[in-house]
Amino acid sequence: MDNSLHATTIYAVRHNGEAAMAGDGQVTLGQQVIMKQTARKVRRLYEGKVLAGFAGSVADAFTLFEKFETKLQQFSGNLERAAVELAQEWRGDKQLRQLEAMLIVMNKDAILIVSGTGEVIAPDDDLIAIGSGGNYALSAGRALKRHAAQLSASEMAYESLKVAADICVFTNDNIIVETL
């Protein structure tokens, strides 16, 4: 039996001057057991000016949150620089390479995915999703952005994650939304 804790959905969007990130609350042990339904996977960092969300191993994600916040402090809140430096360290360090998590980080100006393989990716359309329900949330978010532009970013984030929760067994509808 797979005893790793994983599976989630994180979605982030910038729309009409607002930035929002949403995450569900489910933590799954292996493929069969829901261990927790109210986990908080989206956090405010750097004096509340940056949002970060994770998908993957919980313990690994906390390590990455700490390292990313250190990089933000080191580079005076420069999101892109902190993300690139974290990705370089993550990829270059033998111990860190073992971490199994992905991050979405954002501020009012940018959204980035940071991965352990060294990628720092900015989406073309100001929305992105990761995790087991990521493709469902991303699809819903794109449809909302195109056809329901009157919604706020926080409403889009919530509704996109709600769609993912309706489809993905590893995503629940205990949704936390943070906005900037």
UniProtKB/Swiss-Prot annotation:
Q: What keywords appear on the UniProt entry?
A: Allosteric enzyme, Cytoplasm, Hydrolase, Metal-binding, Protease, Sodium, Threonine protease
Q: How is its activity regulated?
A: Allosterically activated by HslU binding.
- From the UniProt record, list the coiled-coil ranges: none
Question: Which EC numbers does the record give?
Answer: 3.4.25.2
Give its localization.
Answer: Cytoplasm
Gene Ontology CC: one annotated term: proteasome core complex
Active site, UniProt feature: 8
GO MF term set: metal ion binding; threonine-type endopeptidase activity
User: Family assignment?
Assistant: Belongs to the peptidase T1B family. HslV subfamily.
What do we know about how this protein assembles, alone or with others? A double ring-shaped homohexamer of HslV is capped on each side by a ring-shaped HslU homohexamer. The assembly of the HslU/HslV complex is dependent on binding of ATP.
- PANTHER family attached here? ATP-DEPENDENT PROTEASE SUBUNIT HSLV (PTHR32194:SF0), METALLOPROTEASE TLDD (PTHR32194)
State what protein this is by name. Answer: ATP-dependent protease subunit HslV
Give me the gene this protein comes from: hslV
